[in-house]
Each structure stands twice: as C-alpha cells, then as structure tokens.
C-alpha cells in the first residue's frame, strides 16, 4: 500500500485516488482553428519522461478535488503535492518524497 498526500485531506490510501494525466497542459486558444493532426497531438501526445513528472490526480474517494503532484516515474515516489491553480514547486532531484 502506498500513501498519497492529498493537499486538502492529508495522507490517504492510494486506492482513494485516480490518475488524471500530465499537469500544466495548456488548452489551445482556438481549438476550432487546429487541424485534425494538431488536435490529435493536443489530445493524445504527452511526455513520458523518466524522473520527476508533474501529474494531475483527483481524490475520488475523499474530498473529490483535483490537485497536482510531482512524482518520480522511476521510483513512484511523490516528491510534492500542490493544489490545482498553484505554481509548480521547484525541487532538486533529492528533495521531498513520500512512499
């Protein structure tokens, strides 16, 4: 079992959360002006970075609020969590972490 820190509720079991994809993806200003190829790239193509990655999560079994997390994709360790709308925290690769 892994505990995930909800910024609203505190640490909770991983089963209470759902993954929501990459965080901080800007919505196109005029989606109607995009070609099919550009629209598909926006919808389906995301980074698959090794290391610290910004992700969206929802606490579906608790407060039902969305938040962002910085997670190490190699170790699965959450380095930081922060509310949606807040700026991404700057971390050194050795900072933070919960397992």
Swiss-Prot record:
It is found in: Cytoplasm. Transmembrane segments: none annotated. It comes from the Bacteria. Inhibited by Zn(2+), Cu(2+), Cd(2+), Hg(2+), Ag(+), p-chloromercuribenzoate (p-CMB), iodoacetamide, N-ethylmaleimide, CN(-), o-phenanthroline and sodium lauryl sulfate. GO terms for cellular component: cytoplasm. It catalyses: sarcosine + (6S)-5,6,7,8-tetrahydrofolate + O2 = (6R)-5,10-methylene-5,6,7,8-tetrahydrofolate + glycine + H2O2; sarcosine + O2 + H2O = formaldehyde + glycine + H2O2. Pfam families: SoxD (PF04267). The keyword Phosphoprotein does not apply. InterPro entries: SoxD (IPR006279), SoxD_sf (IPR038561). Optimum pH is 7.7 in potassium phosphate buffer and 8.0-8.5 in glycylglycine buffer. Zn(2+) binds at residues 6, 9, 59, 63. In the presence of tetrahydrofolate, catalyzes the oxidative demethylation of sarcosine to yield glycine, 5,10-methylenetetrahydrofolate and hydrogen peroxide. In the absence of tetrahydrofolate, catalyzes the oxidative demethylation of sarcosine to yield glycine, formaldehyde and hydrogen peroxide. Can also use N-methyl-L-alanine and N-ethyl-L-glycine. Is very specific for oxygen as an acceptor. Heterotetramer composed of subunits alpha (SoxA), beta (SoxB), gamma (SoxG) and delta (SoxD). This is Sarcosine oxidase subunit delta. It comes from Corynebacterium sp. (strain U-96). The gene is soxD.
């Amino acid at each position: 079992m892994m505990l995930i820190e909800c910024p609203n509720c505190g640490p909770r079991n991983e089963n209470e959360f759902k993954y929501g994809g990459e965080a901080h993806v800007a919505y196109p200003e005029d989606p109607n002006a995009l070609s099919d190829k550009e629209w598909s790239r926006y919808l389906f193509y995301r980074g698959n970075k090794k290391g610290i990655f910004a992700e969206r999560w929802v606490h579906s079994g608790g407060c039902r609020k969305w938040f962002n997390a910085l997670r190490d994709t190699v170790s699965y360790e959450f380095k930081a969590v922060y509310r949606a709308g807040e700026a991404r925290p700057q971390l050194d690769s050795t900072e933070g972490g919960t397992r």
